[in-house]
């Protein structure tokens, strides 16, 4: 607690802020889904550190044709829950950011939001704000779209798991890299998506370096 005291960092939320955070419905209403672009049937996954507890961004991937893909970057739509001038909004404004210490995280928002409602956990429907691109393997963008969406994350990966598949060029995650500690095989279409995304990222990086 010494660092928290030294820098005047708040480590507990006022009870009225926690009450407001606990008042939200967990289930997303059909009306809300109707007002959003639906990506629940598009392959979607998160890639984060092994120790991550909140997953605030996800990738979706769909092959459209031989050399054309739809790639989505989805960010948790916190604004759906944290409305202007509410107690939650004021508390988040005061905190400004989440603080990551060696042994703990001091979150900007109560855990029911940061680790639950706004965390893009696997096998759960979540509200997001998205940037979606139609792109080829070279990284050329043909179409772009931005807006509110609903997603369903199919998989949660750690960086080490994805790196293992990329380096081995196989859909196998070795036990030493696995989140579960046991070796497992990823479905072929998921492995192909990871390979394609890696290839696009490499081409974009090379392009940037030339400039």
Regions found by a protein language model. Give the residues of each.
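Electropositive polyanion-binding surfaces
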Residues: 1-211
């Amino acid at each position: 607690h010494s660092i928290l005291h030294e820098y005047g960092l708040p480590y507990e939320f006022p009870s009225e802020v926690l009450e407001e955070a606990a008042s939200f419905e967990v289930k997303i209403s059909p009306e809300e889904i109707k007002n959003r672009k639906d990506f629940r049937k598009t392959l979607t996954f998160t890639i984060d550190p092994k120790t991550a507890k909140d997953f605030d961004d996800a990738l979706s991937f769909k092959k459209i044709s031989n050399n054309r893909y739809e790639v989505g970057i989805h960010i948790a739509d916190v604004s759906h829950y944290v409305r202007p001038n509410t107690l939650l909004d004021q508390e988040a404004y005061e905190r400004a950011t989440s603080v990551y210490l060696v042994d703990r995280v001091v979150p900007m928002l109560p855990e029911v939001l940061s680790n639950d409602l706004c965390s893009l956990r696997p096998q759960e429907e979540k509200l997001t704000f998205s940037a979606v691109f139609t792109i080829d393997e070279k990284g050329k963008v043909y179409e772009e779209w931005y807006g509110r969406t609903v997603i369903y994350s199919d998989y949660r990966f750690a960086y080490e798991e994805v790196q293992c598949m990329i380096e081995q060029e196989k859909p196998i995650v070795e036990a030493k890299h696995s989140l579960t500690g046991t070796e497992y095989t990823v479905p072929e279409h998921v492995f192909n998506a990871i390979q394609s995304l890696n290839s696009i990222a490499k081409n974009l990086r090379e392009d940037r370096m030339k400039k």
